Amino acid sequence: MKILWISPWFGNYRIPVYENLNKLSGGNFYIICSQENTSDLVREKLKATLGDHAVIMSGEKRTTMGSEESDFANSALVIKRQPGLYKAVKDIKPDIVITEGFGGWAPVGIRYAVLHRKKLCIFYERTAYVERNSPKWRSWYRRIVGTPVDHFLINGTLTEEYLNEGLHFRKTPKVKGCMCADSFGLSQAVAKVTVEDKQALRDELGLKDGLTYLFVGQMVERKGIKELLHVWSKHIETYPNDNLVVIGKGILLDTMKELYDRLPSVHILGAINYDLLYRYYALCDVFIMPTLEDNWCLVIPEAMACGKPVASSIYNGGHYELVKDGVNGYNFDPLKESSILETLEKFHHADLEAMGKKSVEIESDFTPDKAANRIFEACKKVFGKC
């Protein structure tokens, strides 16, 4: 059973999943990706993991309609074409083709599976909320090209609901839990941080002795950082010793620093090398993600693996599976000022240590090996129907 995954873009978190799939398939796992859309580090790790089974293509052609200035979903239509992609797929001769969604490079994989009567799986992450502004023609397109799909590989319940109710794929099999974060190395590094190490970093940043909340993400509109910073000054009226550490880069970075650096409790650090991020995860009491739109926010399970209570936006598609109110954190609406303030306050009355332990327990079901196992079992099921 030869499996091919066509994925133009992915981050480091996917490498362990691919590695496990290759082991499970007995070395019969292949991937085709884009040179332009992946980082040097990702490609280096991919080649070290899969060798010649990783096909890296270049020269992608893009046609854009609409504005790409916004990073919200459906703000623009981008049509992608990769010269030589169909031939590359044909040369591998896969028994099962996995595509990323319905667009991008997916039509080539779908075409191959249909013409050669091979099995087709689609890895899908979108939710009804993320697709709230999707035009009707796009939904019709997805319904049509998704007709031959044998199995959907999805992240969670909200994606399942969208596929069933929004796109009417109720009868097509689906397996949840196919998304994960590569959090093992991060959690191991956090576990080694000493009390003295934490205090040294606290002194370096000039933190007060209240709770420390951590945000890690892009400094863009979609991540809700503006909404969080806007209400912070009201939060510290009640809890003046609390701290907010903000890590990330993006178009809002300079503006946010200009507006909020005057607050002694706000520490906007900009980009931090990934190899040093563990220090800040170890330092914080609570991790917070106020995103206004996300399929499955990876930093939430990363923080959970590090034993942290989490505050998640209800617009994060992963909140349904990952964040249990009052158990390992709280969900909130970042578009409502009162919701943010109430959530920040709740952690002052919670057992943070117990919440952190629950975070680890919940996240343990969303590891790369478990995601790979679910995907491989789905592949075996559809292949068995040949």
Task: Give the positions of each predicted feature.
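Conserved donor-binding/catalytic core segment of Leloir-type glycosyltransferases
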Residues: 4, 207-223, 229-232
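Nucleotide-activated donor-binding/catalytic signature segment of Leloir-type glycosyltransferases, i.e.
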Residues: 254-272
